[in-house]
Amino acid sequence: MAESMKGLHRTHRCTELSNSNVGEIVTVMGWVQKSRNKGGIIFVDLRDRSGLLQIIFEEGDIGTEMFEKASKLRSEFVVAVVGKVETRSGAVNENLLTGTIEVRATELRILSESETPPFPIEEGSKTKEELRLKYRYLDLRRPDLVRNLMLRSKVATLTRQFLSDEGFLEIETPMLTKSTPEGARDYLVPSRVHPGNFYALPQSPQIFKQLLMVSGYDRYFQIVKCFRDEDLRADRQPEFTQIDMELSFVDVDDVISVNERLLQKMFKESIGIDVSLPIQRMTWREAMDRYGSDKPDTRFGMELKNVSELVKDCGFAVFTGALENGGSVRGINANGQGEMPRKKIDALIEFAKGYGAKGLAYLSINEDGTYKSSFSKFMTEEELSALVAAMEAKPGDLLFFAADKDKVVFDVLGNLRLEIARNLELLDKNTYNFLWVTEFPLLEYSEEEGRYTAMHHPFTMPMDEDLPLLETDPGKVRAKAYDIVLNGTEVGGGSVRIFQNNVQEKMFEVLGFTKEEAYERFGFLLNAFKYGVPPHAGLAYGLDRLVMLMAKEDSIRDVIAFPKVKDASCLLTDAPNVVDDKQLEELSIALAKKATEE
């Protein structure tokens, strides 16, 4: 039967006690991690969010009745204990913060009993994720998840402190807003008051933070929930958290400067990592040419080399055919992997096919300087030697080549270098390599839609020198956009915004909107631009992704208290769920019956 904690007040969390507290009478409360009855003495590991503390119940100290109560303790019982802090009489536990002390109990209250949990509540549980998420309230008791959520809280606190000290105002923007279809799908919320009309949950506070700049709030931030109805993967959720900011009277360098100092403070004070400033910058073009990715992982080399010029006249039709069709031939050097078994090479070729490759050409350099290759019979010895030299290869190396349109080649080799690095365990989670990627293309052409779409969003300012190209060659326009990349993951991104109405209208025109359509969707922003707009720019971090990397986790689900799974459902609450007909009727909604196959 549960007891009351009336008259008791917790004096310390478990790991707040140390040798300096020896001799003190304390009251601690928490969950029983485990209990060991040694006959006449019971050892209990008590756990709270701070960690573990050993409690001793000795029959000679507390009497038979309380000792019998202590003998009934099981894992996950919630208890309150009053006792005296002592130096450990037995062996010191070097693995615990409290490993040199223990509390000798004088009073015990069982505040709540527990059924046997469906899985062990312990560090590094091997329990299947589905079961852990179904019982997330138990999973969240595990020390590794406690550490992750404490880290997340610390990062949010440091962010608020830093930005407040830098003159930013924390301002909330609406959760119920207007649907402006462009990019990912919106989550829609039906209006009861306006039948047949819908709100959208915001994919970002983009428009509202720009309106705040128009309103004169020249430095804004918030830590905010955003929503996107898109397919999930390890680093995506339907609802996610952004550290969002916007600044007036600034350009690219100003935004980067503030954020470099924020990252430096955040990493130093939360996980003890020094971030060297300034952070390296690289244009989008250079990132693609060197790494095949606009979010390159720079913890290792294996950079792409363009060998198109070298092979344009060779006898290998795969290479020459790609070049004749306007593509390129590029390669990577897997240093020291010349003895890779054919089975592993074949697995890498299959991997590359998953990114659009028709195949991969490969060449290994034997220790005696001879070559073993899938295409050597089509090239002369001189051509092969020139190719090896261009790839800066030496005996024992293995080269892979892709030949196709640039988009395919970059996608294939960019992902192949990561796969090889994973296989060779080159991705050190204790290394944090930041990189700014700048000067993205403003637009990309959608063959499916037959029009240009914004690579970031339609409010991004073109590079000043590229403005005339909006009229003549929109595909070549570069954006004043910047992403912050950490270990191959984009953790934040932003841009300088368009602040002249004529440029914004031109941007919408290039995107295929008529003036009427642009005003229908974004009229409130375009109208605001008629009343004096400061130059402004901003950036948003994905807090979930950032903390995931700081915590050295592989999925953002491990740094979110109550995450969704890949089909966007919640295993804990069974959301989404069917609602009553009455609720639908109040919202003037009727569900269409799906046709079923007979």
From Swiss-Prot:
GO cellular component: cytoplasm
CDD domains recorded: AspRS_core, EcAspRS_like_N
Binding site residues for L-aspartate: E182, R228, H456, R497
Catalytic activity: tRNA(Asx) + L-aspartate + ATP = L-aspartyl-tRNA(Asx) + AMP + diphosphate
UniProt-annotated location(s): Cytoplasm
Uppermost EC category: ligase
One MF term in the entry's GO annotations: catalytic activity, acting on a protein
GO biological process: aspartyl-tRNA aminoacylation
EC code: 6.1.1.23
Function: Aspartyl-tRNA synthetase with relaxed tRNA specificity since it is able to aspartylate not only its cognate tRNA(Asp) but also tRNA(Asn). Reaction proceeds in two steps: L-aspartate is first activated by ATP to form Asp-AMP and then transferred to the acceptor end of tRNA(Asp/Asn).
Name this polypeptide is given: Aspartate--tRNA(Asp/Asn) ligase
The organism of origin for this protein: Lachnoclostridium phytofermentans (strain ATCC 700394 / DSM 18823 / ISDg) (Clostridium phytofermentans)
Classification lineage: Bacteria, Bacillati, Bacillota, Clostridia, Lachnospirales
